[in-house]
């Protein structure tokens, strides 16, 4: 099929930077990997949730006030309501919203898992993807080390079930990092660059 522009010439259908097509062979491997990970998390007693890709920006900000929405979220104006919408950049704020609104009276702990696309605004791509597929889990209502141990053990189980053998698990605490920069005036872009450098 030839796609022509309005002058009869060939149209270059290039994707935006930071996104890619997943073609059949890779897509088949991806589907099988996703299935393996989801079955493993379900085996640990976690239940699936599937939040929407688009949410009201203020709802995400309220669900997780410390989340760096200015750097991470793609935003748009809803033509129906005039309110600001955000594309999902991470599942954690959405699961915080779900727990606060749909499970406020539920017995703790809550165990949820999720998977799906996320779209992130990355100030400097440097070969990074803007559209990713994320799978993960949240254990809510367990504040002691046993909760951390459970989620780490489940993650290791997922990696092994996926066929990985040679991997390393790094455990950190984001509050330490936030405390260091609490009194330093940085733009969201500068803070993102520093955070990204530390991760690497």
Task: Label each residue range with its predicted role.
Residues 2-200:
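Extended, charged alpha-beta segments that form solvent-exposed binding/catalytic grooves
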